[in-house]
Every structure is written in structure tokens, then in C-alpha cells.
């Protein structure tokens, strides 16, 4: 860590829970962010600002006018430009001292597994069930911690899932690929709510990477109308085809 790093990250380094050792861990880490929408853009901003050494930014979509209500990395001038490339450009302006890789593709199959294998933490910021399930399966197979979130209306949810998966995985809670009846396309979403959830994904990633204990194995639910939180304990499903031990299928 050089003098420039010390000055840039000085407000984090002052924290006993992070200090120089924790900051160096962040600088040496790689985070894969899949989905650069309402969740992924605030998460990416805070992780870049915090000095995570390598951010891999994956999204196959372009910026649309309807995104601008909540996807805070983008401006009107970015409409029809690839989200991954715009994100890389904006984050470089924020922190030119980190490595930023743009993947303008929908990660799936071997490409997904390769990206997960190189990451220290994966942030699932996607918006469809099939993709979430595939990300979860890859993370479990490769023992990569997964931080997943979603938001619709005034509500959000967050999970931190870590090896050895004693509290289960995403499929334990949602055992099939059926899409929820309500999503932001059909029911809408309040921008700050999805921002809260994406920011918390960044916070949990910083904690994991710097060695701060974090409560894993909980489904945390946020009600934006009442500003209330509640947590539900997760339990591994004995017959889970992803994390269920001898019952698990190979990925």
C-alpha cells in the first residue's frame, strides 16, 4: 500500500475492524458483480470506492430510459450504451487505481463457472430466477461466498451465503425456477429501496473480504414503508440438489 492508497482509504483504515491489514485484504480481492441494474450499480460504486482491487462487471444489457429512475451510474446520455462499459468508465473516474473488467455478456455455463472460480465473493444483482439459481449452483460447487439481494415495490431482501453451506443455499429456500408473481417490471420498485439493498450487498462484501464477522444464513427482509427489518433463519434442505451433500447433483 502506497501513500496515495493510505490517503484515499484513510477513513476506513481508521476503523479498528479494518485497519491496514483489512484494507490490504480489500486491495488484494476480486469481486464478481453479475447484473448492473438497481442493485449492482450502487454496490459497484461503494466497492470501487472502498478499494476492492479487482471488480468484474457483468451485464449483457444496454442502458434504457426506464433504468434511470434507480440505476445511479447512468445518465440520459448513456441510453443505448452497454451497461458494463459505462460502469467501467464511471468507476474508473471514481477510482483509477483498481482493476475494472467489463463483461458485456450474460454469464452462463462455463463462462459463469470460470468467473466465479476467480472471484473471492460474488454479488448476485440479477432479476430472474433461472439466473439466480445458476449463480447459486456455481458458487456452491466452487465454494465461493454469495451475496444475493432483490427488491420490488417498497420491499427488499438480502442473503449472505457462505461455505460450508451449513445454513443452506438459495435453492433450499426457492426449490424451483418459477418466477415470483411480483417483480419490478410488473409491480414497480422505489429507487431508494433497491439502492438500500445494493448498498448492503457492498457492505457485506467488505466485511467478508476484510475478515469482519457477518451474520450468514439469514434471510433479511426490509419494509421500506415502515423502515422495519426482520430476519428469518435459513435451514439447509436435506434433499437439496445443490448443497445437500450426497444428494447434490454435479454442476
Curated annotation (Swiss-Prot):
Catalyzes the adenylation by ATP of the carboxyl group of the C-terminal glycine of sulfur carrier protein ThiS. The active site is at residue 184. One of its GO terms (molecular function) is thiosulfate-cyanide sulfurtransferase activity. Pfam families: ThiF. ATP binds at residues 11, 38, 59, 70, 83, 107, 127-131. Changing residue 184 to S: No cross-link formed with ThiS. No effect on ThiS thiocarboxylate formation in vitro. Does not support growth. This is Sulfur carrier protein ThiS adenylyltransferase. It comes from the Bacteria. The gene is thiF. Its EC number is 2.7.7.73. Homodimer. Its cofactor is Zn(2+). Pathway: Cofactor biosynthesis; thiamine diphosphate biosynthesis. CDD domains: ThiF_MoeB_HesA_family (cd00757).
